[in-house]
Amino acid sequence: MPELVATIGFFDGVHRGHRFLIDRVIEEAQRSGMSSAVITFDRHPREVLQTDYQPDLLSTLDEKLLLLSKTHVDNTVVLHFDASLAALTAQDFMRDVLQRQLKVRKLIIGYDNRFGHNRSEGFDDYVRYGKELGIEVICADAFLPDDVRVSSSVIRTCLREGRVEDANRLLGYDYTIESRIVSGYQNGRKMGFPTANLDVTRCQQLLPASGVYAVLVRLKDSVGWKRGMMNIGHRPTFNGTSTSMEVNLFNFSGDLYGQELLVSFISKIRDERKFDSIDALAEQLQHDKVQINMLFDTTYHIDDNLINIQ
C-alpha cells in the first residue's frame, strides 16, 4: 500500500460534515503526492464497549461503503472493532495500525474526534505521538453551514422529531432505510390503499418519528424510484400496539412479499392519529396522497438529491 493521507472515524451516515473532512484529505493527498484513505470500523465501537448497546444507525456498513465510494477517496479501510482494538491506547494505535500496517504519513482528524482506549487523549497528544512516529497530525476545521453544527447525533435528533427535511439537508441526500417486505393485516388493501409492510425487526437503521411521510421507494435489486406514502406507528385506528412500517406505492400493483425495499424519506405530512372510522381514515389517506403528489410535482426534484447513489 502506498503512503497515505488518512482520516479515521465511524462516519455513520457519511453526512456533509464527513464529506467536508474527506475532501480535505483528498486535497492534501493530491498536494503531497500520496494516496487518500478513510479508515472506519465494521461496527459502532460502543457495541463492543457496552454489550447491551443498540446503535441507532443512519447507515448500514454496506450503505456506508457505498456512500464513501462516491467521495472518490482512493482507499477505504474497514477495521474489525473488537476488544483488542478497543484496548489500544492512542499511541499504540498510531504506531501499530496507522504507521506499521497502513503506512499513514498524514492524519487529518475532525475537530471533535478522539480515538484510543477510553478516548482519554486529545489532539495535542496525537500531535506529540505523531512526531515520534513520523505522522503529521492535522486538525480539520469544523463544517458549519449557516452556523449549524453537522453531526450524526444532530441528524438523529432531527429524525426522532420527524424533521426529515432538516435531516436530509444535513446529510446532503434523502435519508433511506432498508428492510424486507412481510405479510401484514391487509387493512390498507380493504380501504383501497394496499401497503407493503416492512419488517421492523430487520431494519438496522433509526426509524423517524411516528407519522405519515412522503417517500420514494424502490426494490433493492431494481432501478427506478416510485412515489409513495409511508406510515410509521402503531395503527391506532385498528387498535394496534406494536410499531409498524407500511408503505403505499403509487401506481403499482404486484406481489412484493419477501423482497428487500429501499425507502427514502422526503417530508413528513402529518402525525399519526386515531380516526373515528375506517371511512374517515380512507378519506384522509386520499388527501395525503394528493398532498404528496403535489409536493413531488412542484417542489421536489429527484435530480437535485443524492438519492441516485443508493
Question: Which ranges hold each PLM region?
Answer:
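N-terminal catalytic cores of NTP/NDP-binding nucleotidyl/phosphoryl-transfer enzymes
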Residues: 1-60
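Residue-level signal for inorganic ion chemistry
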Residues: 15, 68, 107, 167, ...
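Glycine-rich, highly charged phosphate/nucleotide-binding loops
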Residues: 56-64, 88-94
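A glycine-rich helix N-cap at a beta->alpha junction
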Residues: 60-77
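Classical nucleotidyltransferase
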Residues: 84-194, 276-280, 305-306
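Phosphate/ribose-recognition catalytic cores of enzymes acting on nucleotide-derived substrates
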Residues: 184-310
